[in-house]
Amino acid sequence: MWNQFPDNDISSDLSTLADDMIHLDLRKSSLCFTTITSPTTSVASLAEVEVQVKVDEATTLLNSISSHFSVKPTNYGGRGCFANTDLAQGTIIHECSMPLSSTIARPFRKEVCGSCFKFLCGKTLKFKLMSRKNKQNNSTSVSTSASASDASLALYFCSQPCMDQFIALDIDDLYRESLLNVESLFIKGLNEYQYDLERKKQEEEAEIEAELKLENELKQAKNIELFISQKWQEADINCQLQLSKLKPKQRKNFNNLIYLIPKINENEYMEIKYIIGILFQMYKRDNCENNKLSLSSVSLSSLELQIFQLLQSNEIEKVLKYPYLLHSYTNKIYKFLKMSTLEKLQPYITPSIIRSIIGKSLTNVFGIWSIDEPDENKELFGYSLYPSASFFNHSCKSNLIKIKKGSKIIFKLVKNIQKNEELCIHYGNSINSVLEIRQKDLKEWFFECLCERCLEEMNLKNAKK
């Protein structure tokens, strides 16, 4: 799930607007005409112009990613990156200095650096960032004597500079405390189950029953998209109703909310931390003027956040393939966020925003691996999102390589490229495998490869029949 798979389509918002206009049968109209038209026609024309302006703005934004390539429609559908000029082998055509958001799998949270993703061969990292609420561990210095429970509530880094970088990019410790809050609640859930195995069994059975019920309803739904949207709205309404029963002061005390917060598994834990990273970037965008942050880091994350809005969501396709995810998304992840996320991020927790973040992560994130080479035996540590790199399509005979330097990703040409030639990377770990295995892996991510290598192997296979 955590390989990088690019978006190929226009923003879902723009697509929705365009679809609405097609259904309305709007006709093209020039604003310079002086012919008197009906109000309906005028409104329609203005709406059409407004959509075109948004499309033009999106195109301009995407083409500002790099001077070496432009993002254009491909002849096989969707969008891709095409060289603006002839380019020589070895040319670095794009760099991403840091991800918009990232998440580390819980088993590796003490072994993989939270800033640069460095892995010290399974050793516990020594630089730990504790919650400022923890009076006994109020500093950000190296700690080696914390208790087991304290050690669990920390963010881990490989060095002081990496920890300092994380702190510098934070605002009033909001990101730090948000991530540690998820960790704390996850541990509380584990502890509750540890001492009440019967309750754990009952809740697991109830969850399976809820998943099956939702799956059957999904199969019977006449309008799949409408059904999924309704389930998200129901989840939001249920959260609001439960919160409305508490007084404002009670809502601020997590002890009053703990019984409302769902228990999550490790996959949901990863997803929630990733979502919080995006929510924090949205908060930073809206509040950067009031904080002493590096202008370069703010403008960079703001640009990536704008590009993020243009990525394609594959939420519907993923839910249809794995119906149990709808229960996970709505009744667990969304509810967990709504009930437990810190107050400053709450305005961003809406069904539309969380759906967008989840849907776009499914096919656009890069895996954080133990080694940066195609190898089916390498270990997955987590995943990260670089929106500006999400428009490179896949080819089993790619002309680009990804070079990772810490959390930075560099895209470098491995061959000479002609003007207008598409620039492609390869996805997944099966690049050295046979055609059938490669195709099977790619279909998991709703992608069918018809690159030069695949076509050659298909033709060779057909010739042998």
Tell what function each PLM region has.
Residues 37-52, 139-147, 206, 210:
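Compositionally biased, intrinsically disordered low-complexity segments enriched
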Residues 238-401:
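Catalytic cores of histone-lysine modification enzymes
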Residues 102-140, 148-246, 253-259, 394-465:
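C-terminal SET catalytic tail plus cysteine-rich post-SET Zn-binding segment of SAM-dependent SET-domain
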Residues 13, 18-20, 25-36, 42-45, ...:
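Conserved AWS/pre-SET-to-SET junction and N-terminal core of the SET lysine methyltransferase domain
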Residues 8-16, 30, 34-45, 144, ...:
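Intrinsically disordered, low-complexity serine/threonine-rich segments
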